[in-house]
Amino acid sequence: MENLQVKALPKEFLLGTATAAYQVEGATRVDGKGINMWDVYLQENSPFLPDPASDFYYRYEEDIALAAEHGLQALRLSISWVRIFPDIDGDANVLAVHYYHRVFQSCLKHNVIPFVSLHHFDSPQKMLETGDWLNRENIDRFIRYARFCFQEFTEVKHWFTINELMSLAAGQYIGGQFPPNHHFQLSEAIQANHNMLLAHALAVLEFHQLGIEGKVGCIHALKPGYPIDGQKENILAAKRYDVYNNKFLLDGTFLGYYSEDTLFHLNQILEANNSSFIIEDGDLEIMKRAAPLNTMFVMNYYRSEFIREYKGENRQEFNSTGIKGQSSFKLNALGEFVKKPGIPTTDWDWNIYPQGLFDMLLRIKEEYPQHPVIYLTENGTALKEVKPEGENDIIDDSKRIRYIEQHLHKVLEARDRGVNIQGYFIWSLQDQFSWANGYNKRYGLFFVDYETQKRYIKKSALWVKGLKRN
């Protein structure tokens, strides 16, 4: 690893790591927790169950201490909506409220700053049954939940409303890996995204109206799309993909409306798939009021895509095994994902392309100059790892170190070019339950033996600990 370029970080730059409630907590039937959409779906359809997952519900103190001991200054985590409100229209669960206070206080005790998401892919089952984000009545339910958390957990100073809007909508209504498992329903996917942007805007307005101390934003998983070559049709396909996956969300967040260019290309995709979405009267006024009140911009980045024009039947193959070459994506009028020679991929077919992160950061600076401070709250790579033989053995995950270092280098390079990015969070703190892959897809800085729940240190954790400060 002697060729690594990142050996130190700016003194004021925040280095953190991340988790999500349903992927780490376990304890899915403990202390009055309600039922979310995954509890039902996984029980009926999956060989993998998220209990005990990483047992964070009981081991949070150990995991937060590990983060602090290895130089991590912040932890992104989420609150389980159905722990706080087992019945989304009912009363708050005191046991859950006390639990999350203990978690946040543990963070502060260890000098680890909590960054907290309200919704991380885990809608209540009752919300799913009533249309999830397609039903605007559920926006009101979300605002009630957000208001309670903003006012209750005053020790939290960094709030995220919704995590990865497009990833959620695409998983539910395009690829079908997430409940309700619909396929290529473009109307539903885009409508859900718009409604989530509206819900986010209303939550931001609520945050400021309540006079809450701290910062608030939402999290977008941004994936740049590059034409596979210089042919005009592939350039246009990459443009449409970018509007669908990135620009639609960025416009809605930072402008509070969708630009003419965004709507033109989005409507091309929708019309080709006999789809549409509705912007109701008053939506854009709310979004415009909220846009300048976002006090941080939060993005996740894992990969970029290389695009070729595609006109035909919609098809997607999802790689759930980690055997390379099993994934594919073809969406009429949007494009086809293709591999570019020389660009490495993970075992799950994700392109490893740090330049895409740099390009996206520069683009945000140039196209949305009004953006607030940026935090990159997920970046990391999955590996297939096995339990070490010795109790104190260190797991060699040099590939992860290389991945993190390459992307962190691009973040620091973007800072040098004037991008106001002040933090980088590694996904993930410990190995976790994966929504669609179960337990063989390991992202953690710390290995979890799921049978005993023992934590083993990986080399990546030691590399992070060894980073110096300028």
UniProtKB/Swiss-Prot annotation:
GO BP field: carbohydrate catabolic process; lactose catabolic process via tagatose-6-phosphate
Pfam families attached to this UniProt entry: Glyco_hydro_1
Top-level division of the source organism's lineage: Bacteria
Reaction(s) the record says it catalyses: a 6-phospho-beta-D-galactoside + H2O = D-galactose 6-phosphate + an alcohol
Documented EC number(s): 3.2.1.85
GO molecular function: 6-phospho-beta-galactosidase activity; beta-glucosidase activity
HAMAP family: LacG (MF_01574)
Family named by the database record: Belongs to the glycosyl hydrolase 1 family.
The protein, known as: 6-phospho-beta-galactosidase 1
Organism placement in taxonomy: Bacteria, Bacillati, Bacillota, Bacilli, Lactobacillales
